[in-house]
Amino acid sequence: VSAQGKVAIVTGAGTGIGKCTALAFLEEGYAVALAGRRAELLEKTAAEAGPAASRTLAVPTDVAAPSSVRALFSATKERFGRVDVVFNNAGSTAIGVPLEDLTYEQWKAVVDVNLTGTFLCTQQAFRTMKSQDPRGGWIINNGSVSAHVPTPNSAPYTATKHGITGLTRSTSSDGRKYDIACGKSNIGNAET
């Protein structure tokens, strides 16, 4: 299947897995909306794409904020006309903090980005993909082997990655009748 004319949104596109994935989509011919908290890192990702940078759109985004996620999808549709793939990659962690020392704020920060952020982006992707012509698309969630083999002192991260499994399965089921597929990758240790 040709990627010509296809559009992807990649969250966490300024570093690590997100950056590599965004560059891979560009190499395959996709237009890519680069989403992340730090504009300067998104611009660096675009610059690394070389001539393909003309097919990028850097959108500073806080995936935990509904208005920011809506703005990301709106800007992407305005620039490229549609959304074919969403890679929910943005993530946070509090690894190394013993459960008994974990603050509510640390817990909430990880849940807000990893689970709520993925939900908000999935919701906007679903709305967009359901209403575009031709309809449908792919939503790919970044899971983790930590959901199955937790790292010590990683309760919030591990819990959110379990949540991603449930969200992915539910979205996959709900999306079938609209030609929206949803899957997840369980990436092991990687530089992020």
Question: Which role does the model predict for each range below?
Answer:
Residues 60-72, 104:
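The beta1-alpha1 cofactor-binding region of Rossmann-like NAD(H)/NADP(H)-dependent oxidoreductases
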Residues 99-100, 149-155:
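Active-site loop immediately N-terminal to the catalytic Tyr-X3-Lys motif
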Residues 97-99, 106-108:
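Substrate-binding pocket helix/loop in short-chain dehydrogenase/reductase
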Residues 14-16:
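Conserved glycine-rich cofactor-binding loop
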Residues 144:
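Residue(s) in the substrate-gating loop at a strand-loop-helix junction
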Residues 133, 149, 170-180:
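Active-site-adjacent segment of SDR/Rossmann-fold oxidoreductases
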Residues 122, 160:
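Active-site helix of classical SDR
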